[in-house]
Amino acid sequence: MKILISVCGEGFGHTTRCVAIGEALKNDYEISYIAYGKSKNFIEKYGFKVFETFPEIKLKGKDGKFDITSSILNKEYSPKKAIRREINIIREYNPDLIISDCKYSTVVAAKLLKKPVICISNQNYTRYKLKTDLIVYPTMKALNIINERCERFIVPDFPLPYTICEYNLKIIKNMEFIGPLIRYDVDDVDNYGEDYILSVIGGFEYRYKILEELGKIALKNNLNVKLVCGSYEVAKKLMRDLNLNSYKNENVEIIPITTNMKELIKNAELIVSHGGHSTIMEALSFGKPLIVIPDLDHPEQGNNAKKVHDLGCGIALSYKELYRLEEAILDIRNMKMYKRNASKMKELAKKYDGKKNIKKIIDEFFETRKNIRKYYLTDRIANKLINKFKLKIR
């Protein structure tokens, strides 16, 4: 059976969890991807075939502020262009099933070609301020119409009430929680190094001030930090602004790009994140407490940060409150409840293994279709025999 996985390339979280899906399924199914940009390059490193497409939107922001209006209403990228391209890809590859991670142009293309499709997302609802209600809420309503027409709507998160993306969800009839869908296998060994603070804020330059502030705090307090920048341009600027002579220093390590995120997370004491869902899933699956600093005007990240705070496994800070970052670091290091609660989430992640559960769902999907085909085939043969028998009696 052939499965085509389509990836939204805005942010890296969609890409990493789609790689996890491919790795979970590749031994029993033929797997290919639809992707673009850095996501396409990343997936190809795992040896999968990737069809190139176009983005539907492009995330935009400045000085820590996410601009949702400019991201949705942009002249640069058009969903129509992506749909046309993806219709051609689906016709060429002819998959038995399509899995779409927030790439709704692919869902539309699949429905037009009458192909079964499973949606994966950590958001189908939001609470946002009034000035963009006329854009955000109609968009979400339209997407939920699409979501409900998919075979399944899969949420790669812990079940309620431990769901990190709970405040970004509206329960729909075909929704199913499968647990964290991360690339890595989490080892049972607990005696990790845990001797540094890891900043993982993604590759968007408008989050730069978080990196800079954390670097200054580390130099001031002699804290060990590792700062993942997402690009060499950001890394070079950070090195200059912190007056450092190299990427690797006594207690501050600047990492432009990494291919070793598992070891970085596994051996960290705590994680500083921007609130992306996949990063939080990875941190909690390893039992790491978090400091979450969502982009301004980014409701999804803000809601994730609030849930981390409500579960007591981390601290949520506003981008406008970076002056509190030093205090937050000390609180997490000194107050044992954060580590204790994060460790409980790690145990929960072992119980709800997203990769095993997605494999089970796909296996059941194909088994059900096989049984339905067998039933209809048997039914048709039986009808033919009955009709033939009736003719003989006459």
Curated annotation (Swiss-Prot):
Family membership: Belongs to the glycosyltransferase 28 family.
**Which keywords accompany this UniProt record?**
Glycosyltransferase, Transferase
* Pfam families found in the cross-reference section: Glyco_tran_28_C
Query: Per the UniProt record, which EC number(s) apply here?
Result: 2.4.-.-
Q: What name does UniProt use for this protein?
A: Uncharacterized glycosyltransferase MJ1255
Q: Where do the TM regions start and end? A: none
InterPro entries in alphabetical order = Glyco_trans_28_C, MJ1255-like
Q: Supply the source organism's classification.
A: Archaea, Methanobacteriati, Methanobacteriota, Methanomada group, Methanococci
- The answer, when asked if Amino-acid biosynthesis is one of the entry's keywords, is no
From what organism does this protein derive?
A: Methanocaldococcus jannaschii (strain ATCC 43067 / DSM 2661 / JAL-1 / JCM 10045 / NBRC 100440) (Methanococcus jannaschii)
Name a GO molecular-function annotation.
glycosyltransferase activity
